[in-house]
Amino acid sequence: MILRLLLAFNFFPSIQGTENKILVKQSPMLVVNNNEVNLSCKYTYNLFSKEFRASLYKGADSAVEVCVVNGNFSHPHQFHSTTGFNCDGKLGNETVTFYLKNLYVNQTDIYFCKIEVMYPPPYLDNEKSNGTIIHVKEQHFCPAHPSPKSSTLFWVLVVVGAVLAFYSMLVTVALFSCWMKSKKNRLLQSDYMNMTPRRPGPTRKHYQPYAPARDFAAYRS
């Protein structure tokens, strides 16, 4: 895509200034690595004390107005965009610089500067320049490596957590062991109480009923 754009626009004839045209020069190509770019448009015309309009367009047919500023050098200028671009800019004696931010890969295209003198008459603008190809590169984010301090803190927390977990396990085992011993002692005491011989209670003596002794001698006589 970029090669086709270069072939299509790099061989345009040089802009020839005429009485009704302004000469504008741009860099042929800008590479964007951090989603921001500054595009300077140099013109050979004295805009001082004149009402003018400076704008930046996107696409081979300049269909999208990226950024624009209206005014003159005696009043503050506000760069703005009506198409969703994050733009700002700066005016110089012979240069208009457009600051574009938060660019995306799909916004890679050719961009054209346009300078117009609105007042006083006659109306003047520039011939279409060769343009500037803005190539927005895709960003690849690498995971940040933890610093030595954060790594040390992490391992300290891991060791402390392991010690606390081990201590909690020991306390749990000790409590369980004590509970089992206590339960066993209660069972032994209960069995001992059941096996202890009981003292017999008082028993009644059974006496034979009294019977008088018989005198066998009387029977003999």
From Swiss-Prot:
One Gene Ontology term from the biological process aspect of the record: T cell receptor signaling pathway
Membrane-related topology note: Single-pass type I membrane protein
Pfam families (UniProt xref): V-set_2
A GO CC term assigned to this protein in UniProt: external side of plasma membrane
Every Ig-like V-type domain range: 29-138
Predominant location: membrane
InterPro entries with a match to the protein in the record: CD28, CTLA4/CD28, Ig-like_dom_sf, Ig-like_fold, Ig_V-set
Keyword RNA-binding among record annotations: no
Subcellular compartments: Cell membrane
Cytoplasmic side: 178-221
Extracellular side: 20-150
Modified residues (Phosphotyrosine): Y192, Y210
UniProt-annotated glycosylation sites, renumbered to this chain: N38, N72, N93, N106, N130
TM annotation in the entry: 151-177
Origin superkingdom: Eukaryota
Modified residues (Phosphoserine): S190
Keywords for this protein: Cell membrane, Disulfide bond, Glycoprotein, Immunoglobulin domain, Membrane, Phosphoprotein, Receptor, Signal, Transmembrane, Transmembrane helix
SMART domains (alphabetical): IGv (SM00406)
PTM (free text): Phosphorylated by LCK. Dephosphorylated by PTPN11.
Range of residues in the leader sequence: 1-19
Function: Receptor that plays a role in T-cell activation, proliferation, survival and the maintenance of immune homeostasis. Functions not only as an amplifier of TCR signals but delivers unique signals that control intracellular biochemical events that alter the gene expression program of T-cells. Stimulation upon engagement of its cognate ligands CD80 or CD86 increases proliferation and expression of various cytokines in particular IL2 production in both CD4(+) and CD8(+) T-cell subsets.
The protein's assembly and partners: Homodimer; disulfide-linked. Interacts with DUSP14. Binds to CD80/B7-1 and CD86/B7-2/B70. Interacts with GRB2. Interacts with PIK3R1. Interacts with PRKCQ.
The name this protein goes by in its record: T-cell-specific surface glycoprotein CD28
Source organism per UniProt: Oryctolagus cuniculus
Record lineage: Eukaryota, Metazoa, Chordata, Craniata, Vertebrata
